């Protein structure tokens, strides 16, 4: 069973989460806004998690996102042992408007879930993007899938479909 969890500011992250759900079909439960998660332990019931977040860390607060992920990552997730649960993270950003912190949300989610024992999967090649800096790049890879719904010349559906296929192949789920 595959779970898809996200937060959104403008609806773009919802659109991507819905597309991931459509791509996975019956393998996945319907996407859930992280705001609606009442029992964080329920995430352990899944064989694979897709986690999505909108742009954040735009200079106001470099530690917290200002989205519903904040409460979940820092108040709920620390109670959960995610031992070896594969998590694939997608983040939405604006490489032209915020080129110095492109999709930084991926890094925050990655680190919080990894700290709880989850196994992050689905890393991406940063050479496929035009940006200045991102905390979400480590060892030459994005820690998930960055998406720029405004400036990217590659359609979201094409990027996401290929990434979902790669994640499913990588995890065997």
Swiss-Prot record:
GO terms for molecular function: electron transfer activity; FMN binding. InterPro entries: Flavodoxin, Flavodoxin/NO_synth, Flavodoxin_CS, Flavodoxin_lc, Flavoprotein-like_sf. Its cofactor is FMN. It holds the Pfam family Flavodoxin_1. Keywords: Electron transport, Flavoprotein, FMN, Transport. Gene3D superfamilies: 3.40.50.360. Residues 2-168 form the Flavodoxin-like domain. Low-potential electron donor to a number of redox enzymes. NCBIfam families: flav_long, PRK09267.1-4. Belongs to the flavodoxin family. This is Flavodoxin.
């Amino acid at each position: 069973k595959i779970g898809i969890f996200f937060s959104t500011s403008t609806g773009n992250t919802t659109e991507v989460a819905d597309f991931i759900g459509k791509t996975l079909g019956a393998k996945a439960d319907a996407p859930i806004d992280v705001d609606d998660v009442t029992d964080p332990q329920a995430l352990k019931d899944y064989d694979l998690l897709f986690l999505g977040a909108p742009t954040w860390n735009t200079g106001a607060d470099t530690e917290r996102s200002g989205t519903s992920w904040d409460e979940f990552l820092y108040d709920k997730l620390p109670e959960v042992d995610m031992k070896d649960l594969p998590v694939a993270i997608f983040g939405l950003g604006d490489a032209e408007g915020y080129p110095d912190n492109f999709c930084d949300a991926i890094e925050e989610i990655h680190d919080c879930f990894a700290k709880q024992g989850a196994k992050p999967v689905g890393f991406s090649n940063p050479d496929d993007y035009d940006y200045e800096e991102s905390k979400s790049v480590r060892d030459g890879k994005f820690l998930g899938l960055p998406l720029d719904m405004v400036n990217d010349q590659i359609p979201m559906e094409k990027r996401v479909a290929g990434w979902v296929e790669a994640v499913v192949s990588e995890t065997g789920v």
